[in-house]
Regions:
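Start-of-domain marker
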Residues: 20-83
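Intrinsically disordered, low-complexity segments enriched in Gly and acidic/Ser/Thr residues
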Residues: 177-227
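Bacterial Sec-dependent N-terminal signal peptides
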Residues: 1-24
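A short beta-strand motif characteristic of beta-propeller blades
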Residues: 21-29, 61-68, 103-110, 145-154, ...
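Repeated scaffold domains used in trafficking and secretory/extracellular systems
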Residues: 30-37, 71-78, 113-122, 157-167, ...
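Hydrophobic/aromatic beta-strand positions that recur at structurally equivalent sites within the blades
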Residues: 47, 55-57, 96-99, 138-140, ...
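Short beta-strand elements that form the blades of beta-propeller/WD-repeat-like
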Residues: 35-48, 82-88, 125-131, 165-173, ...
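Hydrophobic, well-structured mid-protein blocks that either form specific transmembrane helices
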Residues: 110-163
Length: 254
């Protein structure tokens, strides 16, 4: 019976190792990385706040593109690598970049709005804007330069980390909590201490990506779907999880 037990422990340990792959990245590439993104083509994007740079690598660690700006910026997602939205609160503008990280579109908010705290690009036409100066949530068609809707939205803007709008619900991640609102700014749900870096949607699932774990919103709470306790940063694409740990990049397949 004891031998049978040890066999299963060995099998579990072997399977755990086979699920992990050390990707071919130089440790210098991974130092001082503040954010990590992975698209569904196996490409990895590393953001460094030190020089406001985003660098794209293939799965072998070969550089495919590099973007450097003069002000800090926030990449929303690389789920569509042909149109990567990037918002700079300092510059008050949203830029879209192509698969080579070349700029293909710029939307400047200074002339039309007050102070935009956060942006969510719903698609290639519509944006959701949180205007801190007017305390409003704005639905904006930037292709037509037209405001579609504007809602009073008197919430705490100061600590906002990320924003997502889906099916008439507004998901707000802050340094303090995670909250869900309707368009009247009525709070539907609040979960304190989310400790997340960004919100991500996969089909109907809302995910919170933290420093070392990824959680899924499950009714009124979070369910952990991936965790790497010693990780510096984690992220995922539709097929795998990515972990930076001790200046190495690992890939985990479920």
């Amino acid at each position: 019976m004891k031998l049978f037990k040890y066999f299963f422990l060995f099998l579990f340990f072997t399977c755990s190792l086979s699920a992990q792959k050390n990707m071919a990245f130089d440790s210098l590439q991974l130092r001082e990385v503040q954010d990590l993104f992975a698209d569904d083509y196996g490409n990895v994007y590393l953001y460094k706040n030190k020089d406001f740079s985003l660098t794209k690598y293939d799965s072998l660690g070969n550089q495919k593109g590099k973007l450097m700006l003069t002000l800090p910026f926030k990449i929303q997602s690389v789920q569509n690598p042909l149109n990567i939205p990037s918002f700079s609160e300092n510059a008050q503008e949203l830029k879209f970049f192509d698969q080579n990280l070349n700029e293909i579109q710029k939307v400047n908010f200074r002339q039309k709005f007050g102070f935009i705290k956060m942006v969510y690009a719903e698609d290639l036409q519509q944006l959701w804007l949180l205007d801190e100066s007017t305390k409003r949530l704005i639905q904006y068609n930037f292709r037509e330069d037209r405001v579609i809707n504007s809602y009073p939205f008197n919430i705490d803007f100061e600590n906002i980390v990320d924003l997502l709008v889906f099916e008439s619900k507004v998901y707000v991640l802050s340094k303090i909590n995670f909250a869900v609102y309707d368009f009247s700014a009525e709070k539907i749900l609040e979960i304190p201490g989310a400790h997340g870096r960004k919100i991500r949607r996969e089909n109907q699932n809302i995910l919170i990506v933290g420093r070392n774990k990824i959680q899924k919103l499950d009714d009124l709470t979070f369910k952990t779907v991936f965790s790497a306790e010693m990780a510096a940063i984690v992220d995922k694409n539709s097929a795998a999880y990515f972990v930076i740990q001790a200046n190495k990049l690992y890939l985990y397949r479920p």
